[in-house]
């Protein structure tokens, strides 16, 4: 999702997305450790999305 679209979301919606992404990131890490993950860029992309959402949540709370 684009950053502009994320900024238009409510904090509760962002928190739901954050939880979903954290679960996905955990699954990708486990797949990576067990050598089942084919596309390693998924790890970086989810990590970046998590950071973007956390930043937007903090900006909205300030």
Swiss-Prot record:
GO molecular function annotations of the record: structural constituent of ribosome
Keywords: Ribonucleoprotein, Ribosomal protein
Source domain of life: Bacteria
One Pfam family cited in the UniProt record for this chain: Ribosomal_L29
InterPro entries recorded: Ribosomal_uL29, Ribosomal_uL29_sf
GO cellular component entries: ribonucleoprotein complex; ribosome
Intrachain disulfide bonds: none
Protein's GO biological process: translation
Signal peptide interval: none
Alphabetized NCBIfam families for the sequence: L29
UniProt similarity note: Belongs to the universal ribosomal protein uL29 family.
Name recorded for this polypeptide: Large ribosomal subunit protein uL29
Native species: Vesicomyosocius okutanii subsp. Calyptogena okutanii (strain HA)
Source taxonomy: Bacteria, Pseudomonadati, Pseudomonadota, Gammaproteobacteria, Candidatus Pseudothioglobaceae
Gene name tied to this protein: rpmC
């Amino acid at each position: 999702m684009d950053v502009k679209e994320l900024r238009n979301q409510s904090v509760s919606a962002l928190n739901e997305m954050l939880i979903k992404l954290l679960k996905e990131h955990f699954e990708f890490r486990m797949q990576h450790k067990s050598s089942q993950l084919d596309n390693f860029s998924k790890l970086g992309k989810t990590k970046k999305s998590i950071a973007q959402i956390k930043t937007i949540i903090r900006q909205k709370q300030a």
